[in-house]
A protein has these predicted regions:
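Short, flexible loop/turn segments with low-complexity composition
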Residues: 195-205
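Acidic-basic catalytic patches of nuclease active cores, encompassing PD-(D/E)XK
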Residues: 59-81
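Intrinsically disordered, low-complexity boundary segments flanking structured domains
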Residues: 1, 28-29, 68-72, 153-159
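Generic detection of long, well-ordered alpha-helical segments
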Residues: 32, 59-67, 176-186
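Nucleic-acid nuclease catalytic cores
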Residues: 77-99, 103-196
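Charged, glycine-rich intrinsically disordered N-terminal tails and low-complexity linkers that flank
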Residues: 1-64, 205
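Generic structural marker for isolated residues within well-ordered, non-membrane alpha-helices
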Residues: 39, 70, 140
Length: 205
């Protein structure tokens, strides 16, 4: 992995994301029709335009609360959880992730942390569900695809408005179902990128 220590949501960070499959967008690969995502990435690659998604009130809440949630996570787990700006895959520079945190041991990342700060209703649903919510599965699994050394990813939901404010669910790389899923993802990622390159070549003919 290649770590770029840039501030998330800065101009430099947005520029690094251009034409790159990141954690927040990786789910588009698995849609029944992923062609719009193909064109989105090609447009970014060819134009260099930074298209910032509208920031909703819920997103602003999450951005503001994330540092508080990470501090709570550190206190609860005693983990050496470090904020990282942007991480690029060693072999494929079109794959990257902006982790909420990586957990280090002896100077090596051994785990990832994906934080959500949802509404109380959603937080309670996540606690009762006892697993990674379906809408965040691709994002969580993307950590394993980018950072080879991590052995687990903690999905964290944080809501300081209730007594059970922190929910942590750990996904292990060596879980047989996870290992099988990761093999499938490798094929799908490469298949998608081959498709994108074919579309781009046709456009540039």
């Amino acid at each position: 992995m290649k770590i770029k220590n840039v501030e998330q949501r800065s101009k430099e960070w947005f520029e690094m994301r251009l034409g790159v499959i990141t954690g927040s967008r990786v789910g588009n690969i698995f849609k029944s029709n992923n062609v719009p995502f193909v064109y989105e990435l090609i447009a970014e690659r060819l134009s260099g335009d930074i298209i910032e998604s509208p920031t909703t009130q819920a997103m602003m809440h999450g951005i503001m609360m994330e540092p508080v949630a990470l501090d709570e996570y550190r206190m609860r787990t005693n983990a050496d959880a470090r904020e990282v700006g942007f991480v690029i895959h060693d072999d494929h520079d079109w794959l990257a992730i902006s982790p909420d945190a990586l957990v280090y041991e002896n100077g090596v990342p051994i785990g990832g942390v994906e934080i959500k700060c949802p509404s109380t209703k959603k937080h309670l649903e996540y606690i009762n569900g006892g697993k990674v919510p379906a809408q965040y599965k691709h994002q969580v699994m993307h950590y394993f695809m980018i950072v080879d050394s991590i052995q687990w990813v903690d999905f964290v939901s944080f809501d300081p408005r209730i007594s059970k404010k922190l929910f942590i669910f750990r996904v292990h790389r060596d879980d047989p179902d996870v290992a099988l899923d990761l093999e499938m993802r490798k094929m799908e990622y490469l298949k998608f990128w081959d498709k994108l390159n074919k579309y781009e070549r046709k456009i540039l003919e």
